[in-house]
């Protein structure tokens, strides 16, 4: 377990220490659960009262939220971002085992970089290129001619199909599948003809893919996820989707084929984006939204129906079916009023 002084942590995040600068810190914790060897954070002023009761050794706070109720603090402009950087320093996630397991199968034509780890029963197929300092967990499969950059981590059970391209410093969680066929079929006299999916998946640097998320390969062109994107668990990214830099997508979201998502977008959980439409930069889509047409202006968008009491929902559902008739009646009343005037 790593140990840092409060001053070292403050220097790391560009903050100012108030209190004992040599206080040793071993871990991060919440305000409620922290003990004297931990540092907590306050990112929302609504919870400032918790400073009165916390047992944390120190707290990361903004200058306006600092309080005499805590003896030691690091003052920063953005407490949440500072917490994230300190949490990275004090991360206790187990590191993958070093070296290449005896049970791993590596094709003779594969190129393996320096300091690469490959877990038990993993298969590295022909023509694969793996960059330096990359770790591939047990029971993974890397398909022919796929390229994986330096400093990547693939947890157990990741599958990457043929000819995909993965950048540097990517993190793929267990069960994620990259490069499976997109859903491409042509109707033919009541039957379906499969369209070979001949494109690739190209994932740029510093991308995180959540557990059991699937990213389909392109039909002819590539499916592309740009640098800095973060995608949560159990998402479906269909063929020929393009996601621009630093976009975040929460769990169970579906991006249909050939949609384009701009930079710095945030898409809430269980949302659905229609195929062949574009979403511009800096758009926030609330959870459970259904986006069926292009979004051309930055802002916040929502379309989900909030939960309500069952009886209320049934009444509103019945009224919803009457909307078209009510609209026609209102238009007729407006016409009659205009005629009378």
Curated annotation (Swiss-Prot):
Broad class of enzyme this protein falls into: transferase
UniProt pathway: Bacterial outer membrane biogenesis; LPS lipid A biosynthesis
GO biological process terms held by the UniProt record: lipid A biosynthetic process
Keyword Membrane: no
UniProt EC number: 2.3.1.191
GO cellular component: membrane
GO molecular function: N-acyltransferase activity
Annotated active site: 239 (proton acceptor)
Annotated keywords: Acyltransferase, Lipid A biosynthesis, Lipid biosynthesis, Lipid metabolism, Repeat, Transferase
Transmembrane segment boundaries: none
Catalytic reaction equation(s): a UDP-3-O-[(3R)-3-hydroxyacyl]-alpha-D-glucosamine + a (3R)-hydroxyacyl-[ACP] = a UDP-2-N,3-O-bis[(3R)-3-hydroxyacyl]-alpha-D-glucosamine + holo-[ACP] + H(+)
Subunit text: Homotrimer.
Purpose: Catalyzes the N-acylation of UDP-3-O-acylglucosamine using 3-hydroxyacyl-ACP as the acyl donor. Is involved in the biosynthesis of lipid A, a phosphorylated glycolipid that anchors the lipopolysaccharide to the outer membrane of the cell.
Similarity annotation: Belongs to the transferase hexapeptide repeat family. LpxD subfamily.
Name of the featured protein: UDP-3-O-acylglucosamine N-acyltransferase
